[in-house]
Amino acid sequence: MERVWFAKLTNKGTIKIGYISFILLSLLCQSLIGLVNADFNYEGCYSAADIQSAGLSLKNSYIYQSVSYCQNQCPESAVVALFNGSDCYCGNSVSFLTSLTKSTDSNCGTKCSGWPYQMCGGSSYMNVYVNAETFVSSVESSSSKEGSSTSYMPSTTSSLSSAQISSTTRRTSTDMKSSEMIATTVSTTSTTSSSTSSTTSSTTSSTTSSTTSSTTSSSTSSTTSSTTSSTTSSTTSSTTSSTTSSTTSSTTSSTTSIFSVTSSSSSITLSSSEHTTVDSRTSSPSSTLVPVSSSSSTLSTPKVTSMTPSTSSTIPIVTSVELVTSVVTKAIVSTSDQHQETIFVTRTSVVERSSEVATATAAASNNRSNSTSKQRLSGGAIAGIVIGVVFGVIFIILILLFLIWRRRKSHDQLDLEETKHYQPYSFGDEDANPIGPPPSSGTTNWMRHSRGNTAGSIGTSNMYGFSMSNGANYSSPSSNTSGSIINNLAGLQDATVQKQNLPSTVFEEANTLNSANERFSANSLPDMMMSGPLQVVNPDNPDNPELSSTVSHNRA
């Protein structure tokens, strides 16, 4: 009964321990899956044809495919996509997603072959995941700038005297200022004006207009950018008075400066180009010196571009760009038949000041990205952890069951009834009553007899457990006469009387058993502990004189 109860208890304990182990394993798997998926964000469901045309390559086709397994196969990729439940695609750019149309998630309803609780695309659609830790190492933006164009619109006034025509030389200076910034697209028109003048004075006014807009944006998944735009307009007028005689001038001016902006990490590099325009004029032999004008403009405009991340981590770049533009106009006029040349030189220099905060943020993001990449676990590592936990739990359960069984076995009480031979005067020995008297009544070990003593080793003088002290020898009836038989019976009676003074022979065993649980036969111990010898209570032949004399003698 106790063993049946113990078996039931063991089965119940095994079921409870197995249930707890299953819960722990489930929690461990969920935490590991969450750790692996922490670096990727779900972007949406897109058409498989569009994703494949964007350059994503097939990484593997796995019968036990899952979202985490696909992401572990492409740890350094910017985007991963799952198709038809078992195919995994990887890509290194996310810019193509802005030009694609997102589909509904119902089109990506195919379950993953290795983990049916997640969706892995559809028959013609893909689930797309974007790596949130991907650092946008370079932002390419093209910016072009066309220089200011000057339109000369001369107007003439004929109100001069002959004295002024003879020889008059005047010099004027024109100051021209232009403001320019980094621009994505700036369109400028160049206007050419030509006039023929036969007067002694001319007034020239020039207007320079420059409109720039600055837009800087950096896009990652779920990122909003703020755009800073500025417009600068500058108008400069100049007046030139000169005394000429029959002068024909033709002016063509076009200056273009192109800037290319490339942003890599937190540094911006601008390249500038310098163009020179030559303005040729033809004058008559009586031409005089034309004034020389020069102008310069300096612009210092800080531009701040900030990005506010919503769900993913981006690196804000704060950069101050100082653009300095210098326009120098030189006019050289010679006499006689030589040509007049006007040279416009535009020089632009850029001074960059990058914020240290941007550099520190970029370095911190790079370190975090590297540490996160090192902390990723591969699919084999996850499988090994799960298998190790399962076998560890099973091993612990087996050890507990073995200890419980051993403890129960050690506490089981030994039943002496099962070890007995059910023989009278016996504690389980094969020889219930070995014949052999103690060596002497004075020794202390008279109860410790050797159980190897048998009747064959006892001589005629030590028969029936006692010695013939009277010197009578027992012999077989065939070799004795009637007188010798009577003598032997008399000696036997004397030996019986002497035996009454001897202690009873009790064959004890070592105290190796629990004395409280010992059980003995009902007929063994009481009879053996009596001081007198055994007697015949109901003799078969009460008329036998020998037995009657023996009984009466013992009673006396």
From Swiss-Prot:
Residue spans, topological domain Cytoplasmic: 406-556
Membrane topology: Single-pass type I membrane protein
Residues annotated as glycosylated: N84, N367, N370
Location, primary (coarse class): membrane
Domain of life where this protein originates: Eukaryota
Region (Disordered): 142-257, 269-312, 425-444, 534-556
Compositionally biased tracts (Low complexity): 142-169, 184-257
Keyword vocabulary terms for this entry: Cell wall biogenesis/degradation, Glycoprotein, Membrane, Signal, Transmembrane, Transmembrane helix
Compositional bias (Polar residues): 546-556
Record-linked Pfam families: WSC
Keyword Glycoprotein: yes
Protein name per Swiss-Prot or TrEMBL: Cell wall integrity and stress response component 3
Organism listed in the record: Saccharomyces cerevisiae (strain ATCC 204508 / S288c) (Baker's yeast)
